[in-house]
Amino acid sequence: MSLDLPPPPARGCRSTEVLKERGQREVFCGLTGIIWLHRKMQDAFFLVVGSRTCAHLLQSAAGVMIFAEPRFGTAVLEEKDLAGLADANAELDREVDRLLARRPDIRQLFLVGSCPSEVIKLDLHRAAERLSAHHGPAVRVYNFSGSGIETTFTQGEDACLASIVPTLPATEARELLLVGALPDVVEDQAVSLLTQLGIGPVRCLPAHHAAEAPGVGPNTVFALVQPFLGDTHGALTRRGARHIAAPFPFGHEGTTLWLKAIADEFGVSAETFEAVTAAPRARARKAVAAASEGLRGKSVFFLPDSQLEPSLARFLTRECGMSAVEVGTPFLHRGILGPDLDLIAEGPVLSEGQDVERQLDRVRAARPDLTVCGLGLANPLEAEGFTTKWAIELVFTPVHFYEQAGDLAGLFSRPVRRRAILRREAAE
């Protein structure tokens, strides 16, 4: 069977030496993961133990007024807490008691660490154990850190899911586990394709409700749908589950290779695979070709933001005809991203971590056609004449699998097209 995919490059980037940057960072903290997790996990509540700055970040990022009672909130540490003049643990217990009395629908409560709680060394792990014993079994209390001292942007989801894994029930069943939060419509598309291939049962982490939590054991195999889940990958492996390594499902090639790796694991025939994937694969290829017309032959520079960067570089270079100058990412997990790196032709700089001024110097020297960066860097670069793409949009917009492949290409082509229009208007 031919999947009608281009051959892999003679030499990929898996063994490329990585430039490690350890300087000033410009990136959101891990608290931002709560914005999509609280929508996904419908009987969970995320209680950030932090400052008013944390509360303002969450409220403005989510676009939700706090009186609407979303499934997140902030237990604000006051000056007396920071000065050690109050028993922060006793106050936290009282806040949790009040919250659970007012919101009896909560079945999972996450105590989320922040910069202030890390600075005063508030032991939220012990607090979660204490509160679980008090409020269980109706409510299970977890903890993870979203502190900007310890985490960047998408690491919040990784820390959250990694905190859940040790509590998942044990199972001997042969099951596929999809790991990573996706919009419901995209998750449904993935499960539908896998079901048509005859693969099942398919379980998801995170689950919508605590009662739907998947089991994990030595016969569990898991496929990641997000490349930033290194800690969750490790936690599942320690429970005996086995990872199905594959490129991530961005674009028609990434989606096809991701599905093919799972299909091979479950012994799906080539004929069945072709019958199920041929039509959506063709639609995705056509959509990407149309949306990426203005990208071909252009260069792209990724500043580190979300850990999606290597997978997206593979998509842009393989499916959209771009060339990558530098692929920067906050952390580079070769065990997870190796299959994507294998498909990026040798040449671009791979960098891990951030040193903003040095990386901006390299952007200015390279003069790429498109720079993918965080919100704080985009406007200054635009003022210097660079074309930029906000990296945050690639996290909050549905971009996985066949039906979103054209939309993904469009996210990159729109700023390039906008710049071309502005140049034409300026010349007239």
From Swiss-Prot:
Binding site for [4Fe-4S] cluster: C29, C54, C115
Entry GO MF terms: 4 iron, 4 sulfur cluster binding; ATP binding; metal ion binding; oxidoreductase activity, acting on iron-sulfur proteins as donors; oxidoreductase activity, acting on the CH-CH group of donors, iron-sulfur protein as acceptor
Reactions listed under catalytic activity: chlorophyllide a + oxidized 2[4Fe-4S]-[ferredoxin] + 2 ADP + 2 phosphate = protochlorophyllide a + reduced 2[4Fe-4S]-[ferredoxin] + 2 ATP + 2 H2O
Pfam families xrefs: Oxidored_nitro
Iron as UniProt keyword: yes
EC top class, as a word: oxidoreductase
Metabolic or biological pathway, per its Swiss-Prot or TrEMBL entry: Porphyrin-containing compound metabolism; bacteriochlorophyll biosynthesis (light-independent)
A single GO BP: light-independent bacteriochlorophyll biosynthetic process
Cofactor note: Binds 1 [4Fe-4S] cluster per heterodimer. The cluster is bound at the heterodimer interface by residues from both subunits.
Required cofactor names: [4Fe-4S] cluster
Family: Belongs to the BchN/ChlN family.
Its job: Component of the dark-operative protochlorophyllide reductase (DPOR) that uses Mg-ATP and reduced ferredoxin to reduce ring D of protochlorophyllide (Pchlide) to form chlorophyllide a (Chlide). This reaction is light-independent. The NB-protein (BchN-BchB) is the catalytic component of the complex.
HAMAP family: ChlN_BchN
NCBIfam families in the cross-refs: DPOR_bchN, PRK02842.1
Name the record gives this protein: Light-independent protochlorophyllide reductase subunit N
Species this protein is from: Cereibacter sphaeroides (strain ATCC 17029 / ATH 2.4.9)
Lineage: Bacteria, Pseudomonadati, Pseudomonadota, Alphaproteobacteria, Rhodobacterales
